[in-house]
Amino acid sequence: MVVFEITILGANGGPTEYGTQCFILKPARTEDPELIAVDGGAGMYQLREMLVQGRNENEGDDELVPSFYEHDREPIEFFIDSKLNIQKGLSKSLLQSLKRQGEHFESANTMKKTYEVFQGITDYYITHPHLDHISGLVVNSPSIYEQENSKKKTIWGLPHTIDVLQKHVFNDLIWPDLTAERSRKLKLKCLNPKEVQKCTIFPWDVIPFKVHHGIGVKTGAPVYSTFYIFRDRKSKDCIIVCGDVEQDRRESEESLLEEFWSYVAENIPLVHLKGILVECSCPLSSKPEQLYGHLSPIYLINELSNLNTLYNSSKGLSGLNVIVTHVKSTPAKRDPRLTILEELRFLAEERNLGDLRISIALEGHTLFL
């Protein structure tokens, strides 16, 4: 049974600025147009493009996705597991819910429709405050005041995220401090690590975990990111949506990933784990010192192997969808996403992880898990 709809607004790991990480989430088949987002590296531009794609969905290139390497476009099946339930554009249930809100949506122009969809995003869960995870949200934020009836937005995050957003982004220097505006349409709120938070609009639990994401260039101080568990309270099904991450550092006293996987294995039966959206930024050829707080296939497979060991299932992680995000667009001959996907599948088979379903997160598509 499909429980979660996940629309990929952006999954690019840089250095190109287009479509950096942002996912919008909703329960499957609901009639409510409200949405939540994980990260805000993309936004209204990508929503507008998806609405245009939906209007032109019969123009014949639905099964090709942008690549810009060996070919400018490649068949979608090169990037995804054959069993992945995926659709180009916004989900039909979301579009239908918007139409039911009023006849004006059907007759509205594309820009007005874009505003309608964006206004439905009431909550952002930010993994960390790097620009590629917040730029769309920040630039889009004044649109909250474009319409009198626009909904308020709350930006959630662990303290390492919210403190930086308040001090260094919404500070009237880098960007207007819209959190101080009288109507309070934009709020920043802190979450506590490992503490269950009830989602404000869906019958979901949200559980954030702090993870490592490298060290500062100048200070050498640890940089942190966040993994979010979203749990549907009715079905008990869960998805994990990850920010940037590296393996636990040997010199650190914090075994954050080890603690996270232990929590997952102890609290989420494998049958209820619908999918993991997780970064794998660089191919195997990358040296450890070139990862800069990210994962390559060997390190991601190591983490999945640790999870497999904790579950101790005779079938491995069979049936689990792993959606790979944040691949860097490096100047290679072959699309790095295809290289990384091939390497991950080979290593997963070598480690006997079972029928692990590994796919690449594709911008402009919706997943049904």
Swiss-Prot record:
InterPro entries according to UniProt: cAMP-PdiesteraseII_CS, Pdiesterase2, RibonucZ/Hydroxyglut_hydro
SUPFAM superfamilies: Metallo-hydrolase/oxidoreductase
EC number: 3.1.4.17
GO molecular function terms attached to this record: 3',5'-cyclic-AMP phosphodiesterase activity; 3',5'-cyclic-GMP phosphodiesterase activity
Swiss-Prot/TrEMBL keywords: cAMP, Hydrolase
UniProt cross-references to Pfam families, sorted A to Z: PDEase_II (PF02112)
Catalytic activity: a nucleoside 3',5'-cyclic phosphate + H2O = a nucleoside 5'-phosphate + H(+)
Keyword Amino-acid biosynthesis: no
Function, in words: Controls the level of cAMP in yeast cells, together with the high-affinity cAMP phosphodiesterase (PDE2).
Note: Present with 1400 molecules/cell in log phase SD medium.
Family listed: Belongs to the cyclic nucleotide phosphodiesterase class-II family.
Protein name: 3',5'-cyclic-nucleotide phosphodiesterase 1
